[in-house]
């Protein structure tokens, strides 16, 4: 007799034939679209509605050999996000975009290499987490998006505060990952509408670490305007 639920789960898992497995019997683009539709439904993407973006540049300055543009954007009616663009100070034409999604930390300023709170310097230095700074060095125009529940979008100086909004989102038939995908797509709309003279989506990439890596993984499934995606972690293979 078995009294261990894990043993039972392994047996049940071995007997499952996943409905959405790829068998090679159908064209891969068709399979991808089928999976996207199913994933979108699971995440609650149908709960989102486009709104007036209320785009506003709040800062445009030059420092440390780089140009730094900050803007805010309404991605859903009643919700705004913070975005920061880093560019080389001497720019001759549009640069491919690199969207940087910071993970569980005090906020997107970590991606910019800016220490705002105690412990930030070690967070940046200890994991090479100043992604946007590195992206500029590699020839990209970097864009750091403040993810929901982090930093200026619901976090605190001690770190993320995403548990309550995440649980509430589930009660509303959606999830935080869906919200972060939606925000990223709306930010891309803003880039195309307002920054086409300095940024291009040709050759663009999306990258992230920790919670930013998880968001990047799902963005790769549903947002196809990027040429490449680099989630370093955390990625679940189910």
Which residues does each PLM region occupy?
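Proline/glycine-enriched tight loop/beta-turn segments at coil->beta junctions
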Residues: 78-80, 88-97, 104-107
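Primarily recognizes the serine-hydrolase "nucleophile elbow" in alpha/beta-hydrolase
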Residues: 186-238
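Short amphipathic alpha-helices and their capping/turn segments at secondary-structure boundaries
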Residues: 83-90, 132-135, 218-221
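Structural recognition of the beta-strand scaffold that forms the well-ordered cores
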Residues: 97-100, 143-144, 205, 228-231
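N-terminal targeting or regulatory segments adjacent to alpha/beta-hydrolase or S9 domains
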Residues: 1-67, 75
């Amino acid at each position: 007799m078995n009294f261990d639920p894990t043993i039972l789960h392994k047996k049940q898992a071995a007997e499952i034939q996943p409905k959405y497995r790829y068998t090679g019997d159908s064209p891969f683009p068709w399979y991808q679209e089928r999976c996207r539709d199913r994933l979108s439904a699971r995440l609650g993407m149908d709960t989102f509605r486009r709104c007036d973006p209320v785009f506003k540049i709040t800062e445009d300055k030059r420092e440390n050999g780089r140009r730094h543009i900050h803007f805010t954007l309404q991605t859903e009616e009643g919700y705004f996000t913070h975005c920061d663009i880093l560019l080389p100070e001497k720019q001759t034409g549009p640069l491919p975009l690199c969207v940087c999604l910071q993970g569980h930390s005090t906020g997107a300023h970590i991606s910019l290499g800016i220490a705002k709170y105690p412990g930030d310097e070690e967070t940046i230095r200890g994991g090479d987490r100043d992604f946007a700074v590195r992206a500029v060095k590699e020839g990209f125009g970097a864009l750091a998006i403040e993810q929901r529940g982090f930093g200026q979008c619901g976090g605190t100086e001690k770190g993320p505060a995403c548990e309550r909004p995440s649980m509430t989102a589930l009660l509303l038939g959606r999830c935080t990952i869906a919200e972060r995908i939606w925000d990223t797509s709306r930010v891309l709309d803003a880039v195309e509408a307002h920054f086409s003279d300095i940024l291009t989506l040709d050759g663009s990439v999306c990258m992230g670490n920790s919670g930013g890596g998880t968001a990047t993984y799902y963005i790769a499934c549903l947002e196809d305007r990027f040429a490449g995606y680099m989630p370093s972690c955390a990625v679940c293979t189910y």
